[in-house]
Amino acid sequence: MAAQKINEGLEHLAKAEKYLKTGFLKWKPDYDSAASEYGKAAVAFKNAKQFEQAKDACLREAVAHENNRALFHAAKAYEQAGMMLKEMQKLPEAVQLIEKASMMYLENGTPDTAAMALERAGKLIENVDPEKAVQLYQQTANVFENEERLRQAVELLGKASRLLVRGRRFDEAALSIQKEKNIYKEIENYPTCYKKTIAQVLVHLHRNDYVAAERCVRESYSIPGFNGSEDCAALEQLLEGYDQQDQDQVSDVCNSPLFKYMDNDYAKLGLSLVVPGGGIKKKSPATPQAKPDGVTATAADEEEDEYSGGLC
């Protein structure tokens, strides 16, 4: 089966080359027909799991489409070449081609397709190169934002923010979360704004910037419904505990369901939050100590003894 598909692919390549040849009666290459044959060759090689040959066929198809000024189809072919590289576990090279495809989609006036390609590239590279994935998600968010598709934009910004937190790039994470919060405010999704304020505060406290954390809460009072919400009360309690270096109070807040059931990356920030100087523990109630022999009874004991024989 594989051998048959490989032969089929080679036949399509040969046909494509013929379409590109010029002669006495054919002055211009037939790029459209050549691109079609290269595409068929790529499919045949892919079915035979010959990904290197499939990738090469896709690249030739892309060039043929470019020569024919068919940018959208050229971009599709570059994207397919990228997916062949993904099958070969060559992820950075795959992302490079998918990025190229997305730029061509934009040039062609199809921003939605460009954004989807960039997001796909981000997912591919996320575990290998988180920094690159952040860049791709931010690019995707910008494309969606330019198209006024704010819900899609903020979703991608959220992915970027979580990756920044995971990589402990807190300065960048703080800016990214603020951008998310601004968009949620614009689309009037106020409850999510409250959650983003919690995320902001945790990030700022991990940056050891209490002033910025407090400012976030203060600025959020202008968001409808925030003042008086459980999010607001919890944050005020958290900041109070942090300011007073009360580790117990901080831990109690960060272990509450409100914090524990946030996105995993933010929940971890809460659980790992330590107040400056290591914090102080609340004093546990003093346990009554045994009285040494010969020590006089307390006033309460004496009072009890006084009436032990009754009132008469």
Curated annotation (Swiss-Prot):
Family, as annotated: Belongs to the SNAP family.
GO cellular component, one term: mitochondrion
Chain positions covered by the region annotation Disordered: 281-312
GO annotation terms (biological process): intra-Golgi vesicle-mediated transport; intracellular protein transport; membrane fusion; protein stabilization; protein-containing complex assembly
Function text: Required for vesicular transport between the endoplasmic reticulum and the Golgi apparatus.
Chain positions found as Phosphothreonine: T287
Tagged with keyword GTP-binding: no
CDD domains: SNAP
Modified residues (Phosphoserine): S284, S308
Name this polypeptide is given: Gamma-soluble NSF attachment protein
Gene: NAPG
